Amino acid sequence: MENGVVMEDRLIAEEIKKLKEERNAIILAHFYTRGEVREFADFVGDSLSLCREAVNSKADVIVFAGVHFMAESASILSPEKSVLLPVPEAGCPMADMVTVETLRKEKEKHPDAAVVCYVNSSAAVKAESDICCTSSNAVNVVNSVENREIIFVPDKNLGAFVSLHTDKKIHLRPGFCHVHENIGKEDIEELKNLHPEAEFLAHPECRPEVMSFADHILSTSGIVKEAGRSESTEFIIGTEKEIVQSLKRKYPDRKFYPVSKKAVCYNMKKVTLESILNSLQNMEYEVQVPEHVRAKAKKALDRMLSVSGT
C-alpha cells in the first residue's frame, strides 16, 4: 500500500511539473505545510520570505501552499500574477479575530496611534493599517514608526513580545494563534527535564510565560537559522511541529524535539499534492482583492518590505 501511495505521489508530481512549465507557474509553501508539499515546492519559507518571493518571482502563476491571508498578500503585492489557493477553506482563525469594525473603534479610542498589523490578517484590515509586520521584523517595524503610540493587531502575544523591545506605548487586541497559545509552560518543563542541555527556541506567538523559558525568541525562519549556527546540538522547538521534520533533514547531526505533539496547524495541512494538481489543471481557486482595498493594503505591505530591506 505504501509503495502504491508513493507511486501515486510521483505520478501527481510529474503532472504538476508539466503544468508548471506550461503555465509558467511556481509553488510557494509555508514551513507548516505537509512534508510532501514542501518537498515539491519551488520555495519554502515564512510569511516574510514568501512575500518577498511573490514580489520577485518572474512567474505568471503563483500556487500558494498555505492559508488564505498568505495568498491574499501575494495577490495584493503582485496583481499582474494569477495567485491560486488550492484549498479555499484553508483559513487562519487568528486573522478572523480582528475586523475592520473593531479596528476602526480602536483608532477612534487612540487617535494619535499608528496601526501596525501582523500579516496574519485580512486584506481589509491591512487596508485600514499604516504598516504591516511579520514575526521576523515586528520589532524593527514598530521602532520605524514615528508615532509614540501603536495599535498592534491581531496577535496579543507577538505584541507583548514587541513591547519589551520598544519604548512606544502598545495597545493590544485579544487575538492569538491557537497552535502557539496552546503550548503551556508544563510542556517546556517536561522537555527540559528530559533534555536539560537542549536550547529552547520559541516563536513570539507563544504566551509570555512560555517565552520566559526561551533561550531565543525567533520567527520560523529565525529558528531554522539559529539551529544551524548554534553550538548546541539539541533543541526544543517552540512552534508548529512540522518544522521539526525540516530541521532534521537540514541538520541531520542535531536533535530536535517538538515542544508539543498537539502543536499542529490543521489549516496548513489541508493543502495536498492532489489539491495543487487540481489547482493548476483548472486554474482555481484564484484569489483576487478589490482594487480599492488592494491599493491601500499594498501601501501597508510595501512600507513593511522597505523596512525589511527588500
UniProtKB/Swiss-Prot annotation:
Which amino acids does the record list as binding iminosuccinate?
H30, S47, Y118, V119, N120, S135, H203, P204, E205, T220
Write out the catalysed reaction.
iminosuccinate + dihydroxyacetone phosphate = quinolinate + phosphate + 2 H2O + H(+)
GO cellular component terms, alphabetically, are: cytoplasm
EC identifiers of the protein: 2.5.1.72
Which residues of this UniProt protein bind [4Fe-4S] cluster?
A: C92, C177, C265
Give the location in the cell: Cytoplasm
What stretch or stretches form a coiled coil here? none
Q: Name one GO molecular function term.
A: metal ion binding
Pathway(s) of this molecule? Cofactor biosynthesis; NAD(+) biosynthesis; quinolinate from iminoaspartate: step 1/1
The cofactor binding remark recorded in the entry reads: Binds 1 [4Fe-4S] cluster per subunit.
Cofactor names? [4Fe-4S] cluster
Nucleus found in the keyword field: no
Keyword Nucleotide-binding in annotation: no
InterPro entries the UniProt entry points to: NadA, NadA_sf, Quinolinate_synth_type2
Pfam family membership, one: NadA
The free-text function statement in the UniProt record for this protein reads: Catalyzes the condensation of iminoaspartate with dihydroxyacetone phosphate to form quinolinate.
NCBIfam families recorded: nadA, PRK09375.1-2
The protein's matches in PANTHER family, at most eight in alphabetical order, are given as: QUINOLINATE SYNTHASE, CHLOROPLASTIC, QUINOLINATE SYNTHETASE A
What family does the database annotate? Belongs to the quinolinate synthase family. Type 2 subfamily.
Recorded protein name is Quinolinate synthase 2
Q: Which organism is it from?
A: Methanosarcina acetivorans (strain ATCC 35395 / DSM 2834 / JCM 12185 / C2A)
Taxonomic lineage is: Archaea, Methanobacteriati, Methanobacteriota, Stenosarchaea group, Methanomicrobia
Protein's gene: nadA2
